[in-house]
Amino acid sequence: MADKKEGGVHRFYKIEDGKTVKLRHICSRCGKGFFMAQHKDRRSCGKCGLTEFNQ
């Protein structure tokens, strides 16, 4: 059998003091459940294509 991949949404969250903390930004157009990809100089949404540049 193939090796199991560690994927899924759980890698976008971290648990601190019994509470979950989001590690990525959420797309302002798509809403909850759609995380933005982190790049060196920007954040981008893979669904709608929204790009936010870092200051």
From Swiss-Prot:
Entry superkingdom: Archaea
Zinc finger extent (C4-type): 27-48
Transcription in keyword set: no
Cofactor(s) this protein requires: Zn(2+)
GO CC annotation terms, alphabetical: ribonucleoprotein complex; ribosome
Magnesium as UniProt keyword: no
GO biological process terms held by the UniProt record: translation
Cofactor stoichiometry and binding remark: Binds 1 zinc ion per subunit.
Key words of the record: Metal-binding, Ribonucleoprotein, Ribosomal protein, Zinc, Zinc-finger
Residues the entry annotates as binding Zn(2+): C27, C30, C45, C48
One Pfam family linked to the record: Ribosomal_S27
GO molecular function terms noted in the UniProt entry: structural constituent of ribosome; zinc ion binding
SMART domains from the UniProt entry: Ribosomal_S27
Signal peptide: none
Family that this chain belongs to: Belongs to the eukaryotic ribosomal protein eS31 family.
Subunit structure, interactors included: Part of the 30S ribosomal subunit.
Name of the molecule in the record: Small ribosomal subunit protein eS31
Gene that encodes it: rps27ae
